[in-house]
């Protein structure tokens, strides 16, 4: 059998068009689908914990862990031997509250919502709950700053210079906010939403290709 070759102009246009779409699908959709399969696998591991403990159990566990951290940091801030600003305690308390609430909302959206609710709410709130612990740990542990806060600062500079330069957004952010203390937690909470939506979309793409059982 010989290879078919387009002869007329419409055939040539259609042939080139479909080949271009196929190439784009191979270069773009295939890697995204593979990423979706990987994300779905690890998300299922986290979801199994939510299934065993339930929404109330997961929320209670997060409340105990984050509450213990907040109380411990408050106790340290009251010691005269340690120079810990009260603002640092408030930053830890606020991040603890956000992380606990995010855990509860992610678990609730996954349990009671459909696919749309999972993409719109569950993944972003789950990312927030995952991102905040290392950031808060770095805020209260100076030894971790070089591993968490300094790379976060470099990432913020890169995003401002290469993505948010449109319309002078980067200049406004630099003039309005200062990246220190609780601002690191706010930064990662902001990143978690677009990243969560992206991961939710690639998982939905993977489900279209091969639905999960």
Give residue spans per PLM region.
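Extracellular/lumenal glycan-associated context and N-glycosylation machinery
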Residues: 16-20, 24, 87-89, 141, ...
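Cytoplasmic juxtamembrane interface segments
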Residues: 98-141
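Transmembrane alpha-helical insertion/packing segments
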Residues: 1-100
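Hydrophobic alpha-helical transmembrane segments
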Residues: 162-195
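Alpha-helical transmembrane spans of integral membrane proteins, capturing the lipid-embedded, hydrophobic core
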Residues: 59-67, 128, 189-197
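Hydrophobic core segments of alpha-helical transmembrane domains
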Residues: 96-104, 194-195, 199-201
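Juxtamembrane non-transmembrane "cap" segments at the membrane-aqueous interface
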Residues: 137-169
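Transmembrane alpha-helical segments in integral membrane proteins
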Residues: 30-44, 182-212
